[in-house]
Swiss-Prot record:
Name this protein carries in UniProt: NAD-dependent protein deacylase
Chain residues that bind Zn(2+): 120, 139
Cofactor binding summary note: Binds 1 zinc ion per subunit.
Biological classification of the source: Bacteria, Pseudomonadati, Pseudomonadota, Gammaproteobacteria, Vibrionales
InterPro entries xrefs: DHS-like_NAD/FAD-binding_dom (IPR029035), NAD-dep_sirtuin_deacylases (IPR050134), Sirtuin (IPR003000), Sirtuin_cat_small_dom_sf (IPR026591), Sirtuin_class_III (IPR027546), Ssirtuin_cat_dom (IPR026590)
Species of provenance: Vibrio vulnificus (strain CMCP6)
Length: 245
């Protein structure tokens, strides 16, 4: 690695939150908490059975607020990295939980939305939401009050804040991917974009992802083990540069 790094972009996926007890989508059988993805994570599913979809996310929201669900060592290490690095750390997450915020990160882009927010289905106005969203809960910001929905990007919808993400990738000198499958685009293409702009690239995963060949450096194991080790290395080199200055 070419230390020190000043502009770090970290992409995180379900693997980083799984160790905190957040249930992940099982791609091998297309189920999420025993529901078909097309039933609970598509606009068509919401139109077909809004009660089912609202209940599904209401249950996920309750689970996220369970006192037993806490940031793990990987989240805490990334929070420390942002706080102590002499530069910029941007977290781009595919996760809809708030574990990065609770782990200490502030510069976070939720490209797939946030579970603890709801959104007007017409105006797209977003509000904080810690309780249940029910069919019939309306947003009154529109001339015709409209149904509230989870602030979550469903399959077939455009991810959020893509312009900001690509701007961060253009200036990144280090790109780290943690706990991602490498099969969901556009996120799976971020490593290529970062490399095109000269960034060093690192994959941290339980096993090689579908795009592992794109990465210069690979570290396989639990995120809660590998991420703190990497952060220690990054900050140690930062300190050694300060001492030698």
């Amino acid at each position: 690695m070419n230390f020190p790094y000043r502009n770090i972009v970290v992409l995180t996926g379900a693997g980083i939150s799984a160790e905190s007890g957040i249930q992940t989508f099982r791609a091998q059988d297309g189920l999420w908490e025993n529901h078909r993805i097309e039933d609970v994570a598509t606009p068509e599913g919401f139109a077909r059975d809004p009660d089912l979809v609202q209940d599904f996310y209401n249950q996920r929201r309750k689970k996220l607020q369970d006192p037993n669900i806490e940031p793990n060592a990987a989240h805490l290490a990334l929070g420390r990295l942002e706080a102590e690095l002499d530069g910029q750390v941007t977290i781009v997450t595919q996760n809809i939980d708030n574990l990065h915020e609770r782990g200490g990160n502030k510069n976070i882009i939720h490209m797939h939305g946030e579970l603890l927010k709801s959104r007007c289905s017409v105006s797209n106005q977003v509000i904080e939401e810690t309780g249940d969203i029910l069919t019939g809960d309306l947003c009154h910001c529109c001339q015709m009050p409209s149904q509230m929905r989870p602030h979550v990007v469903w399959f077939g919808e455009m991810p959020l804040r893509m312009g900001e993400i690509y701007s961060a990738l253009e200036t990144a000198d280090l790109f780290i991917s943690i706990g991602t499958s490498g099969v969901v685009y556009p996120a799976a293409g971020f490593v290529h974009d970062a490399k095109m702009h000269g960034a060093h690239t690192i994959e941290i995963n339980l096993e090689p992802s579908a795009i592992e060949s794109e990465f210069v450096e690979k570290r396989y194991g639990k995120a809660s083990v590998e991420v703190p080790k990497l952060v220690e290395e990054l900050l140690a080199h930062l300190e050694s540069n300060v001492e030698s200055a």
